[in-house]
Amino acid sequence: MVKIRLSRFGSAHNPHYRIVVADVRRPRDGGYIESLGHYDPRKTSENFLKIDVERANHWIAQGAQPTDTARRLLRSQGVKISKK
């Protein structure tokens, strides 16, 4: 099964996340199929959230299931996601 989820990177006490498409059997920060964007929860810059909406829609159409946090971020960028 493929999920759209967050993968942590950044230094200690300064988290940043990649929004990635990954197989559920892979570790959180392990290999992924495709990166869809990035998210800075500390909002240190104007573009703290960037998502490739076209590719996100493609993966959702292919059956990728977003995690709860990824679902919230995708919806904030206008990606249409059906109910669970």
Swiss-Prot record:
Q: One GO cellular component from the entry?
A: small ribosomal subunit
Has the keyword Ribosomal protein been applied to this entry? Answer: yes
Q: Which UniProt keywords apply?
A: Ribonucleoprotein, Ribosomal protein
Pfam families membership = Ribosomal_S16
One biological-process term from Gene Ontology?
translation
The keyword Phosphoprotein is assigned to this record: no
What top-level branch of life does the organism fall under?
A: Bacteria
Q: Which InterPro entries match?
A: Ribosomal_bS16 (IPR000307), Ribosomal_bS16_dom_sf (IPR023803)
Gene3D superfamilies tied to this protein? 3.30.1320.10
GO molecular function of the protein, one example?
A: structural constituent of ribosome
Q: Which PANTHER family match?
A: 30S RIBOSOMAL PROTEIN S16 (PTHR12919), SMALL RIBOSOMAL SUBUNIT PROTEIN BS16M (PTHR12919:SF20)
Q: Could you say which protein family the record assigns here? A: Belongs to the bacterial ribosomal protein bS16 family.
Give the protein's recorded name.
Small ribosomal subunit protein bS16
What is the originating organism of this protein? Answer: Deinococcus radiodurans (strain ATCC 13939 / DSM 20539 / JCM 16871 / CCUG 27074 / LMG 4051 / NBRC 15346 / NCIMB 9279 / VKM B-1422 / R1)
